Amino acid sequence: MKDDIALNINPLVSYLKKPKNEFTKADIIKFIEEKEIKMLAFRYVAGDGKLKSLNFVITNREHLEQILSCGERVDGSNIFPAFMHAGSSDLYVIPRFNTAFMDPFSEIPTISFLCSYFNKDGQPMENSPEYILKKAAESFKKVTNMSFQAM
């Protein structure tokens, strides 16, 4: 296990000395502050299958803690026009800490996250690609007793 961490290509894993599935908000904040990271990028898949991005300049710790805890509101009717109507389209993209990585293409030091969709009540959005895939994987495991390692 130590070799997996020491030789890991993700700078967050090697710096924090823990596997990515154990990352916490406090770990991410520590890395951001000590490495002087300037931006966050929230990445999420829209209904059309395209990867979208929301970028945030880190202005202060309070804002950083809020955005990592609560995510950001997005208009679901633009992202999932087939499923959501403009009147009831509040969604939140919440970062999954275990997906954090340094963006190798950004000129500004940036940490990117893959995000999950949640509704205004804090429940996962059932029509999101991630949720559908998760449910399919659970059904597959229940029937076959096998699981997908890529997930």
Question: What spans do the regions from the language model cover?
Answer:
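ATP/Mg2+-dependent ligation/transfer catalytic cores
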Residues: 1-151
